[in-house]
């Protein structure tokens, strides 16, 4: 089940990531639905878009709680949550829900930046810290990033 988290309260330099879910949906109309590699067509799958969450832009924790609650509902219903962001921080809400259902959850992270800071400009809940927060939740405390394996102690 697809849902959007239009949030960008901790982005650096410029806002706009909150428009990501709408932009992804808009551009998806031009996608080819058939994959010759998978010999499958997206139209053969039941995919439901439940729309965007209404998130509080003044509180990262409140926004994350809403994202987590929605992911929990989807997981409890036996479905797979597919989150459209938004800035990187939205990932934390979904990971919080997923680790409750899958305690042995592992994370593979592809990005130009590690997002492993303990805090950024005094904030522990930031796009620049999100992977540190996620990996504090998972076991083992190691994960793969682009071109490197990191170990969090």
PLM-predicted stretches and their roles:
Residues 1-153:
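Conserved alpha-helical scaffold segments that buttress catalytic/binding sites
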